[in-house]
Amino acid sequence: MTTGPSPIEMLTARNLECIRGEHRLFSNLSFSVNPGELMFVGGPNGSGKTSLLRLLCGLSLPDDGEIYWNGTDIRKLGVDYRDVMTYLGHLGGIKDDLTAIENLRISCALAGCEIDEDQAADALGQIGLAGREMLPARVLSQGQRRRVALARLLVTRTKLWILDEPLTALDVAAVELIKGILEHNLAKGGMVIMTTHQELVMSTVTVHHLVLS
């Protein structure tokens, strides 16, 4: 990983600092992620992993430092930055009373990526939920609910994916499926920044590890 903003780097963090209450989670944190690269963010609970991801997707502001997309501070980009970035939080945002299709379509619409019912059903089928598309989320297992949230990765057109614990509650087959989706995005020049407590071997792409303490 390299440091400092540059027009040729796709996502760059420079001297980030994050304070929560009286606790400094991290400071002077700098890195860059380029097309085709994956960065794993690790560290113990409470080290600031989720806080960092929220900074990178613009949901929170750093106490110090800057984040650049293609050489421009993301605070100046506004909606233009959200148009190139997909963020999936660790809770998934799944609503119990909505069907799998409804959950997927609404989450896509909120992210600025409208899809029709057929597209939603196709994505859910690809991610292993064929036959469960019209079931209310309340009857789905935790792993199936997670798949509904992750199905958005199959329809998004964004280059940068920021994923908070995407593998939580997934079985081995589902993890391998998500691994293939990530590799496909990276092969097209996409970028992935993610946290995970599970080991994920990615032998065909450039992988960085950022460990918070």
Curated annotation (Swiss-Prot):
Q: Single GO molecular-function term?
A: ATP binding
EC number(s) per UniProt?
7.6.2.5
Per UniProt, what is the membrane topology?
Answer: Peripheral membrane protein
Q: Decide whether keyword Transmembrane helix is in the record.
A: no
Q: What class of enzyme is it?
A: translocase
Pfam families associated with the record: ABC_tran
**InterPro entries per UniProt:** AAA+_ATPase, ABC_transporter-like_ATP-bd, ABC_transporter-like_CS, ABC_transptr_haem_export_CcmA, P-loop_NTPase
User: Can you say where in the cell this protein is located?
Assistant: Cell inner membrane
GO biological process terms, semicolon-separated: cytochrome complex assembly
* SUPFAM superfamilies reported for this sequence: P-loop containing nucleoside triphosphate hydrolases
Cite the ABC transporter domain residue spans from the record.
11-213
**Family affiliation:** Belongs to the ABC transporter superfamily. CcmA exporter (TC 3.A.1.107) family.
Q: How does it assemble?
A: The complex is composed of two ATP-binding proteins (CcmA) and two transmembrane proteins (CcmB).
What protein is this chain from?
A: Cytochrome c biogenesis ATP-binding export protein CcmA
What's the source species for this entry?
Answer: Nitrosomonas europaea (strain ATCC 19718 / CIP 103999 / KCTC 2705 / NBRC 14298)
Query: Gene of origin?
Result: ccmA
